[in-house]
């Protein structure tokens, strides 16, 4: 097993840069040590991406709360487990793995997560991918934020520099941090989705400006630009994966939130308009415009139980001029719609039972969605729908947990069932595979220290 030298060099450079930064607050290896609070203060299940009200405020204010001291603002994370699909895949999902029943280390990540000054904070991640077997640049969000008062209103204003549209978002109803928060790279997944749902992750760099006014109205706008082939090679993502974004890709976000006793509500909209060159050497382009609605509900009584519900509906308009001209699509325009709804019951911030429903649908295209083993469509359709059930346990992360704040662990069992996959239930790919053959089981462990 070998690791690309440029990616290793990038990881080392990232560490050295932050260690050399003049830390007014003395950076720490984790946000828990920085704030002095347990992980349960920010996370609904004491560990993982799902945020509490305090967690959203911490992120909004640039990761700058707290004055804890430690010389190294570093943390490590590991994700892995056992994955199995109902029917073995036609070929191994990645080199060095079998077509089914795989035990794997999926991710090993190094985090730089700390405040850098009273108004600047960072969340930066470099990850070793267990299926691809190399290091690469991962989610990064560097923020400047400060409180302001004007015209009788209190506000927080800030700027985020990040490399994944929605990674900077405060809610778990947008793609970057959505349920089920973890998945296996070694089982089948739907072959398509909106551009905003991770297609550009780490392939772009953007800046957005945001504000939250009077704790209710959130507004954000900015733009993303594509990164060069050379940059992607240097950070372990490879030029062949470049999306070749042309010009700037505008991003917007608006939301309204309110709290009534033990009930929290938010609803909003977000979107992205991106033009891409499928062939980086040719000028022809495809344009994707994503517009979405989303909502969150949290019930957090004084007792041990809590309920979290998230929902989103993304509509994507596709202008496929480049693909149509190249014969890669049989019509120049198309669309996608992606609906996701999830609900979780959480007990003592240690146990969780969640159910998520997903439905992706779009216009038929017999070339764009052609028959192929496993990933293809006999009907020329992207339509995929199903459900994901997830049971989890977090033994640490509370105020009285042992080894706090140095270690946290999340273990779980995830089961995904498909009613339809790429346009069909039986023989959906034209090679005899059924949608239920892609049903999968994932037993996982998620460790941070």
Name these PLM-found stretches:
Residues 50-52, 74-84, 98-229, 246-262, ...:
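Outer membrane beta-barrel
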Residues 108-110, 140-142, 207, 252-254, ...:
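Membrane-embedded beta-strands of outer-membrane beta-barrel proteins
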Residues 37-46:
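The canonical Cys-X-X-Cys-His
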């Amino acid at each position: 097993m070998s690791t690309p030298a440029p990616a290793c060099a990038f990881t080392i450079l990232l560490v050295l840069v932050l260690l050399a930064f003049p830390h007014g607050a003395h950076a720490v290896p984790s946000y828990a040590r920085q704030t002095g609070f347990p992980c349960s203060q920010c996370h609904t299940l004491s560990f993982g991406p799902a945020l509490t009200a305090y967690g959203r405020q911490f992120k909004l204010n640039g990761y700058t709360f707290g004055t804890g001291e430690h010389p190294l603002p570093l943390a490590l994370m590991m994700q892995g487990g056992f994955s199995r699909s109902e029917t073995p895949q036609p070929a191994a999902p990645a080199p060095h793995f079998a077509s089914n029943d795989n035990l794997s280390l999926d991710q090993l990540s190094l985090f730089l997560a700390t405040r850098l000054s009273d108004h600047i904070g960072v969340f930066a991640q470099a990850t070793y991918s267990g299926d691809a077997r190399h290091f690469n640049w991962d989610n990064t969000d560097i923020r400047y934020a400060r409180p302001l008062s004007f015209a009788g209103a209190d506000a927080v204003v800030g700027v985020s520099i990040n490399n994944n549209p929605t990674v900077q978002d405060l809610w778990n109803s947008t793609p970057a941090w959505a349920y089920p928060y973890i998945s296996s790279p070694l089982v089948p997944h739907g072959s398509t989705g909106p551009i905003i749902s991770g297609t550009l992750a780490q392939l772009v760099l953007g800046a957005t400006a945001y504000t939250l006014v009077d704790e209710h109205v959130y507004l954000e706008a900015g733009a993303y630009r594509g990164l060069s082939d050379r940059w992607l090679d240097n950070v372990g993502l490879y030029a062949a994966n470049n999306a070749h974004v042309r010009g700037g890709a505008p991003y917007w976000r608006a939301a309204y939130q309110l709290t009534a006793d033990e009930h929290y509500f938010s609803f909003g909209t977000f979107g992205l308009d991106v033009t891409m060159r499928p062939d980086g050497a040719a000028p022809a382009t495809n344009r994707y415009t994503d517009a979405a609605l989303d909502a969150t509900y949290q019930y957090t009584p004084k007792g041990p139980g809590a309920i979290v519900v998230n929902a989103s509906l993304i509509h994507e308009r596709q202008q496929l001029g480049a693909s149509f001209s190249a014969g890669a699509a049989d019509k120049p325009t198309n669309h996608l719609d992606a609906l996701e709804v999830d609900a979780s019951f959480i007990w003592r911030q240690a146990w969780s039972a969640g159910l998520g429903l997903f439905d992706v649908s779009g216009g038929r295209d017999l070339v764009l969605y052609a028959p192929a083993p496993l990933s293809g469509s006999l009907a020329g359709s992207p339509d995929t729908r199903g459900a994901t059930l997830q049971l989890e346990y977090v033994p640490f992360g509370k105020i009285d947990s042992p080894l706090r704040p140095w270690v946290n662990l999340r273990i779980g069992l995830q089961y995904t069932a498909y009613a339809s996959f790429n346009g069909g239930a039986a023989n959906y790919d034209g090679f005899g595979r059924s949608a239920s053959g892609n049903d999968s089981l994932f037993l996982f462990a998620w460790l941070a220290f």
